[in-house]
């Protein structure tokens, strides 16, 4: 004597995820029988290319005024110092991106995004109001760490 469940319960059980299973919540994930949940469609290389372009464009906007300050400070070695700064930026980005990414997975993305944006923007007015020329170094580290979050 076997008792079969009604067909409505079978369909409901088949559509629900197993206990403990996490439904996909990332951008571009598609739920069964629905349209795209978030974002502009499935992830593609073009989305990454836009983000990379914006990062280098923003860094270029900061490099132009920084060259003026570098020329005033190191008149004989302006481009050498710019290359050194760019190299340190790349190294710090390489080291900080996985660390900040892992921490943001644990504590959430919003606090890290807000923090990196704040620490990226905070030193720029200080460069303008400071009587000494030490502040030109300040945007390098936060900009390096902050730009890799996006």
UniProtKB/Swiss-Prot annotation:
It is found in: Membrane. Coiled coil: none annotated. GO terms for molecular function: transmembrane transporter activity. Signal peptide: none annotated. The chain crosses the membrane at residues 50-70, 83-103, 112-132. It is a multi-pass membrane protein. Belongs to the major facilitator superfamily. This is Major facilitator superfamily domain-containing 14C pseudogene. The gene is MFSD14CP.
């Amino acid at each position: 004597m076997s008792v079969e469940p009604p067909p409505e319960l079978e369909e409901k059980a088949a559509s629900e995820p197993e206990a403990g299973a996490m439904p996909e919540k990332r951008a571009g994930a598609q739920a069964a029988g629905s349209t795209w949940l978030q974002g502009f469609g499935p992830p593609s290389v073009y989305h990454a290319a836009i983000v990379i372009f914006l990062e280098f464009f923003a860094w270029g906007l900061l490099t132009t005024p920084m060259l003026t300050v570098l020329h005033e400070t190191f008149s004989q070695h302006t481009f050498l110092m710019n290359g050194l700064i760019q190299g340190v930026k790349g190294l710090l980005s390489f080291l900080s991106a996985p660390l900040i990414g892992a921490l943001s997975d644990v504590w959430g993305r919003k606090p890290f995004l807000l923090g990196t944006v704040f620490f990226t923007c905070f030193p720029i007015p200080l460069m303008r109001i400071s009587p000494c020329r030490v502040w030109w170094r300040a945007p390098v580290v936060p900009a390096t760490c902050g730009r890799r979050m996006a």
